[in-house]
Amino acid sequence: MQYLILSLIFLIPSLGMLTGLSIAATVAFFLLSIIITGFISFIQKQEFNKKFFIKLYPRFGFDDIFCIINKIKTELLFTAWCFISCLFAVHPINSLVTFTKVFVLLFLRFVSNAVTFQNVLYIKNSLILGIITAILLFFIEYSSHGFLTRMFKTHFGLYMLDRGCALLSITTWVAIIILFSNGHNINSFILYIVVLYLLSISDSLASFLGFSIGGIIFILARLIKTIFFKLITISLITGSLLFPVIAKQIDPQNLSEKYLATQPSAAHRLFIWHFVANKIIIRPILGYGFASSKYIETGDNAMIDYRGEKLHPLPLHPHNNILQITLELGILGLALFLCLVYKYLKEIDNIKVSNFRAASYSCFINYYIIGMISYNIWQTWWILSGIWILVLMKLLVKPDIIIDN
């Protein structure tokens, strides 16, 4: 089973570069493998009989349960509101199905958190090798116009590597932490520059922006660490609260003509955000219900006429996590979501090792920015990408570094 896990750690970033949607299957299988490994180890170490349960019960009573609930009360409140919002969603059954799927994924993450591994060095090497392979695969596809992809598909577009680039951008921060912890500072810098260049020539603008800003965040977190937590928290929460207001006030047609004439995809996002902001005003407090974005009706008169093309004002999701949360869960859901953001930023700030704290901030911001520009917050592969990073942090950090997951 250990060899299987090592293989998956190598395959997830490398295979993910070529087929981004494979992340959903490989990471889910990875989590199940971890849980099974932990269960087998548990059985081997303990005598599985009545005496064991009698011995175990006094050590894990109601006080422990209340302690766990208290630690995750913010998550529970947000989850409860997501569930309640399913009941008044545009399509309640579909929303409940999506909610169940997301809940199961997060539960797998919660269970896998208790598992530890002995061969950490092999896991680190597998991850770094997987990242290097992903980088090589990108350049092969980029220079050969999709030689490998066209073996399985009829055509190739650089956009097909966007999900792989997004995964690479956040996974690289874990590798940077590993290299820093082993004293390979120059190697970590080289890795950052190589990935930054890769993302700059890719079609994934969101990943490039997230990774670039992540680098700036890393430097600031090291230079002004005494006030950095307050600075990043105020900036992130204030910006998130103001974003729906800004999206309402912008003139997407004018901005697109002036600044995004050569970026039709980015221009389309401005129209989407403006449309969503107007929809939020109709139901600002409660929203339209969990995962309801793709079911909100849009009439023919709402279609966007941009340079002779008809664009949909809300194709599947808002392409912005803050707008999606506000649209679906209302101001109440946004407030709970930002409470979670504050909690996770505080947990990162509690990390004592400077490089690890700075890289964790960078990874968090990287993930956050990509979500602010591109993907559906409830997409299976995107949720599992975040879980993948959390599991790697748990498995690969030094024993003296404590993370409250």
UniProtKB/Swiss-Prot annotation:
Family, similarity comment: Belongs to the O-antigen ligase family.
Organism: Rickettsia prowazekii (strain Madrid E)
A cellular-component GO term for this protein: membrane
UniProt-annotated location(s): Membrane
InterPro entries: O-antigen_ligase-rel_domated, WaaL-like
Membrane-crossing segments per the record: 23-43, 77-97, 120-140, 156-178, 201-221, 227-247, 270-290, 322-342, 353-375, 377-397
A Pfam family matched in the record: Wzy_C
Protein name: Putative polysaccharide ligase RP358
Endpoints of the signal sequence: none
Taxonomy, superkingdom: Bacteria
Broad class of where this protein is predominantly found: membrane
Alphabetic keyword roster: Membrane, Transmembrane, Transmembrane helix
Native organism taxonomy: Bacteria, Pseudomonadati, Pseudomonadota, Alphaproteobacteria, Rickettsiales
Topology in membrane: Multi-pass membrane protein
